[in-house]
Amino acid sequence: MNKSKGTTTRYSTRLVLRIAVGIVFALATVVLVFSGNSVAQRDNDSAQRENGEAQRRTDFCSQTARALFESCKAEVTDGIFKKKAICINISDQKEREQCFDELDDAGEQGNLLCRQQRDERTNACQSLGEGRYDPHINPALFDDDFTNLTHPNPYFPLTIGNRWEYRGGNEVNIVEILNRTKLINGVRCIVAGDRVFKDGDLAEDTNDWFCQAKNGNVWYFGEEVKNLESFDGDNPRLPELVSIDGSFKFGREGDKGGLFFLISPRRGDIYLEEFSLTNAEDVTEILSTTYRFGSNTVLDQFVPQQLAKRFCSSGDCIVTKNFSLLEPGLFARKYYARGIGFFLEVKPDAGEVLQLTDCNFDPRCTNLPSP
């Protein structure tokens, strides 16, 4: 009996051990399976993160748009607090209350513009590409003697002494290639004086700095802008400097130049003219290289027929779309003629036209039609 009882006890013990071992093995298997799945999932998540990070590491244009969006919002906030400080110091209660009422609208409008600029920049990245904007400039590839250019651009002639006069609405615009140069990043640029008169008063006095590449491309390396305003009651009534907005120079505070006019443009080409973030961010897109009046109803819109026929009868005028990433939704179309250069700007949304009325270097400029 005692022996039988001991045998039974040992059998029961072995059975329990076998069951326990089986359970442990099963649990271990389950743990390993789940552990394996967890590792696989972690590997997959890690791979996805790496792919996402790799993509983010190369979407430099979009990164720029996002960074500038945050900068814009911060600037709006800064502006609101400055405006608040101004309101606090207004003694008249009615004026002070009105000032505070304007704060909310200013914030809403400012943040709306920030979002619109972000979207405009992001959309532009799809056309411009995601690469860093960092043009490599070799001074040896540029002319330094503007009296003897290697390959002059017929659509953007930079001959010293050339002068153009444009008119439209209440505006007169005079551009002249001056006998002056600027040395920027080792490249010699010609200075173009650009003066804008509104209602007879000088409103803008700008010096543009253009560089001529030996392959015929024209580059834009900066501008010195003086925005002016004249005030009734001043004696003498002289224009007063009110801002230098838009001024930039390649190599200063992160500013970079850009292409201004290609020697061999093709329809669909798109490029930055200037890269001065939050200050000057103009983009050019080539719409046509074979324009003549009557060939495209969209491009004919607001175009003075006589002017276009004077310069584009051969069907070789170039039309560009020009827009600023700082002014979402707005654009202009510019028209260029061989041997003349820029002769017409149309702003379709506003219906505004600025047209060439005179030049001093080509007989086709004689008796041009008036606006």
Predicted features along the sequence, with ranges:
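Conserved functional acidic sites
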Residues: 113-371
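N-terminal secretory signal peptides that target proteins for export/translocation
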Residues: 1-17
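Bacterial N-terminal signal peptides
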Residues: 20-32
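Intrinsically disordered, low-complexity segments enriched in glycine/proline and serine/threonine
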Residues: 6-8, 21, 44, 51-53, ...
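Soluble, non-transmembrane alpha-helical interaction regions
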Residues: 40-133
